[in-house]
Design a protein with these regions (language model features):
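Anionic-ligand binding patches
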Residues: 2-5, 11-194
Length: 194
C-alpha cells in the first residue's frame, strides 16, 4: 500500500479521507502520525492557496508525498460566505454546533429557494520532489432550517442534498457525493497515470 501524509489533524476530515483513499490502495497517515506537530496558519485568500500552504509546510519538514485539503461552505444568500473562513466563521474556538447556529441565525429570514449553497474542496498534492498538483470538487445543496443527523462534522447537519442532510447520510453515501470525495477521485485518477 502506498503511504501518503495528510496535512491535517482534523479527526473528521482524516476519517473521511482515509475511507475514500483506502479502496485505492493508499495508506493515509495524519501529519502528527508522520511526525509533524505544528499547526500551519491558513493565511491564503483561496482554498487553493491554503491547501498549498499546508502541503508545502508538511513536505518541507518530512520530505515525502503530502496531500492537503482546504474546503468550505459557500452560501449564495451570504455572497459566498463563510468560504475560506468556514472554520473560523463563528469565532476561532467555536464548535461545529456554534458555526451551524450562527449560519442558521443569519439565514433565518431567507426563503427556501434562496438558501442554495455548495461545499467546495481543493486538494493540493505535493510529490516527494516537491511538485504540486491541484484537484477540486463541489457538492451542491441547500441550507436547511435546523440541524438534523448525527454523522459527519462541520456544517453537515444543516447542508441538505435532496431530502437528507449530509449528517443523516452514512459515511459511504456522503463520500459518494461529497466535494472531498470528488476531489479525491480526481487524485486517484491522477495516480493511475503515474
Amino acid at each position: 500500500m502506498k503511504k501518503i501524509v495528510i496535512a491535517s489533524n482534523n479527526a473528521g476530515k482524516l476519517r473521511e479521507i482515509r475511507a475514500i483513499l483506502a479502496p485505492f490502495g493508499l495508506d493515509a497517515v495524519s501529519q502528527k502520525e508522520a511526525g509533524f506537530d505544528a499547526e500551519v496558519e491558513e493565511t491564503g485568500t483561496t482554498f487553493a492557496e491554503n491547501a498549498a500552504l499546508k502541503a508545502h509546510a508538511v513536505h518541507e519538514a518530512l520530505h515525502c508525498a503530502v496531500i492537503a485539503d482546504d474546503s468550505g461552505l459557500l452560501v449564495d444568500a451570504l455572497d459566498g460566505a463563510p468560504g475560506v473562513y468556514s472554520h473560523r466563521f463563528a469565532g476561532e474556538n467555536a464548535t461545529d454546533a456554534q458555526r451551524c447556529e450562527k449560519l442558521l441565525e443569519l439565514l433565518k429570514d431567507t426563503p427556501a429557494e434562496k438558501r442554495t449553497a455548495r461545499f467546495q474542496c481543493v486538494l493540493c498534492y505535493v510529490n516527494a520532489a516537491g511538485e504540486e498538483q491541484f484537484f477540486s470538487g463541489v457538492c451542491e445543496g441547500v441550507i436547511g432550517t435546523s440541524p438534523r443527523g448525527e454523522n459527519g462534522f462541520g456544517y453537515d447537519p444543516v447542508f441538505c442534498v435532496g431530502e437528507q442532510t449530509m449528517a443523516e447520510m452514512t459515511d459511504a453515501e456522503k463520500n459518494q457525493i461529497s466535494h472531498r470525495g470528488k476531489a479525491l477521485e480526481q487524485l486517484e485518477d491522477f495516480f493511475k497515470t503515474l
